[in-house]
Amino acid sequence: MARSLPYSKKIRQVEALLPEAMHAEKHAVMSELKRLKRKTNSGAPDGSNGPDASEKAVRSELDRLEKRLRRSMAQKQRRRKNRPAVDYPENLPITGRSGDIIEAIQNHQVVIVSGETGSGKTTQLPKFCLAAGRGVDGVIGCTQPRRIAAVTVANRIAEEMGEAPGGAVGYRIRFQDRFSKADGFIKIMTDGILLAEAQGDRYLNTYDTLIVDEAHERSLNIDFILGILRKLVKTRKDLKLIITSATIDTEKFSKAFDEAPVIEVSGRMYPVDVEYMEDADEGAEETLTYVEKAVEAVDEVIRRKTPGDILVFMPTEQDIRETCDTLEGRGYRRTRVLPLYARLPAAEQMQVFKTMPERKIVVATNVAETSITVPGIRYVVDTGLARISQYDPRSRTTSLPLSPISRSSADQRKGRCGRVSGGVCIRLYSEYDYASRPLFTPPEIQRSNLSEVILRMLALNLGEIQSFPFIDPPPAKQIKDGFDMLHELGAIQAAAQKKDGRGRIKPGAPSRKGPRLTRRGRLMADIPLDPRLSRMLIEAAARDCLAEVTVVASGLSVIDPRERPEEEQQQAEAAHAQFTDPASDFISWINIWRACFGAPAMSRAFVRAKDLKAFCRKNYFSFKRMREWQDVHEQITLILNDSGLGGETPADTAPEPLPEGEMDFSAGYAAIHYAV
């Protein structure tokens, strides 16, 4: 019988297999080998006096690790053999730079690719990574800011490679995983998925290459990912990182990643004519809403009798529904009107990508601005608006106002047409207005309540905000204010401090660890809203008055809609008085809501635009602000329902229905005010 190898020789034998194993297995086995080495060095037998129970356990463990590595080696060999062949569409501008980009990926750890709209960067870069030899030691991961983009990009790459989605190319989004761990090479995912994976594996060992697409959007998720990767590339020298965007601040990103090389790719653009709408005369009353202006613009395009599909950008889902209803009522011949927004069911989203005999009019939010390409678009109608979160440090509130988009976003929208032929972009604002807008939308971290950022970082275990390597670090005072607010709301507990032998806190002693989330704080972190609002809504849910407090919370997020024209102040005050509760402004908000939109409920409050206008004229309210209140209420309701907080009250505890037009606050009055 052959004599067993000593520990040291057996360990060296296992270590010799490491280079040919997949990276994730290599990392896991190395950790276990370190543990075994510590065990053997601490006095475990070496086999010279015959194996005992401890020695057998160690040898068994080494045999197990060897088998694990050999399985991983076989998998790596299969991946090397089965790596898909790739080619690139000749009509894409990025194809002309394929050699330069592949060489940069091979020779540099981090590469920045700045590609204009239509360059093909989103679909071709993962294939360039395969051509550069990546995807064997681990997966090529690519993040997208939206679920619809992740799905459509994965499907497009799979189609170009002659693969079925879920094989060599797959995707993972919330509640849906179509990626094969055994056979997958390219994985497209939302940035939120990668963040979640980083909590379970801080070294992201599954991946040998990561592509962060649309980095110019600078959402909190993207900034969190870039911060994680700034640290990770220093410890994982084998990891390749590509940062890509249509409109990126290349100098800032290159500097953040140690002067990483930048490759610029031009876009494929047929000529696009831009038509502007002149501003109304100063002092003149605006008679048309942006929805009505957009519909008139579509009417004009239809009258031109030139072919091509139409893409209309709207800021909110409510606007999309109203626009679609109005356009369908026009009765255009051989035309199909299709909505597109993030929460639309996937089957309905996919309709916009299909080739149809009818002319398509797609009405979309800014999900259609980047990453996804709706085929056949020749006309773009741009309202120039989006709902952009904004924190006001003076009032300490976060709102979701309708805001003018940046020039960069406007150019992205323009780039959606002119992909297959000359296009026309109709902007429902003036050229002067466009020129006066900022070049980029400020990063979300600069528009956010820092308490919300801190809350999310604690929930994601990202470490202390003061030392996190943000691309644009927040000011120290704002960080302090953020912590102060979270303490006030009961969302975090102060760090425990070191104590002496008698249990007394040592003067000036550092804390054992940073602040931690309370149970309430963890609930708040699950609701992506201003922490003061999420705290209010959690309390309301516990006190069975969530629908009413959602009305109040959304009302507090917009400008007071009540109007008092100088020449009609008495009439306005009389109209407002019918909704006023003498003891509570909050109940007054609920009274207004009930009169206009019906009883508060955790569902969409729908009222036709013409009916809302009539209500506003009669009662001296701003149509624009009432509409904004309605939109914010819908956003909060959707967030609460997604988080599980907005579920219906069980039937056996539901209150008696109230007579129409009446509201008995004897039971709920105190609960509402305690929550608020």
Set out the residue ranges of the language-model regions.
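Extended, charged helical/alpha-beta scaffold domains that provide interaction surfaces
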Residues: 114-116, 485, 522-528, 533-676
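P-loop NTPase motor module signature
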Residues: 1-536, 655-657, 661-665, 674
